[in-house]
Amino acid sequence: VESGAIDCIWGCFSMDGREEVYRWAGPYMVSRQVAAVDADSSIRALSDLAGKTVAVQSTGKPEEIFLTGSDPRIPQSVEVLSIENRSVQYAMLACGYVDGIAAHETGILQYMKDNAVDFRILEEPLLVTGLGIAFAKNDTRGLDSQLTDTLAQMRADGTLERIIGRYLENASQYLEVDTIGA
C-alpha cells in the first residue's frame, strides 16, 4: 500500500495497534478475536489453556497476543502453533491435533456452519477491535474520509446489516462499532 501497488488493504484487517501506521476508513465492523475448543473439552476459560496447544494463523492478532506474553489472562505455558493457512487450524482442532484455536469469531462460526463441526467458543474474547480499510499514510486523495462517510451512511440506512446478515447470524452485533473500547 505504501508503494502504491494497491490502493488499500481491506479484508478483516484490524485497526488495533495499527492506528498510527495507516490512514483508516472505519471502523465499519466489530471483530472479536476468540479462542475455541472442541465442544466436549474441559477448557472453559483462557486460564485453562495452561499446558495446552493452540493453533493460530501466522501474522494474525491471536498469534501476536499469544506470543508476546503481554496479556496476563494468557498462561505462559501455552504451546502456540503458527499456521500459514487458517483452514488448517480449524481442521487441526476438528481432528484433535490441538487443544484449541484462536481466530476471528466470524471465521470460526462460518467454518462450523460449512463443515458441520461443533466447537465451543470461549466466553472471554482475546480482543475486541474494529475492522477498517487501511490506506497509505502518505495517501492524500481523501478516499479514507469518503469511504468512512459512505460506510456510516450504509450503517445508518441498514445496508451494512443486510449485507452482513446474508453471511452471519445476529448481524447487528457486528455493527456496534461505537462500543469498541467502552
Segments (PLM) and residue ranges:
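Periplasmic-binding protein-like
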Residues: M29-V37, K113-A152, N170-A182
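Ligand-binding cleft/hinge of the Venus flytrap
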Residues: A25, P62-I83, Y90, M112-A116
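Beta->alpha turn/N-cap motifs
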Residues: G4-D16, A39, Q57-K61, R86, ...
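Short helix-initiation/N-cap motifs at beta->coil->alpha
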Residues: S41, V80-A91, C95, L127-T129
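A ligand-binding cleft/hinge motif common to bilobed small-molecule-binding domains
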Residues: C12-V21, I65-T68, M92-A94, V98-L127
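Acidic, polar ligand-binding/catalytic clefts
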Residues: V1-D48, R120, P125
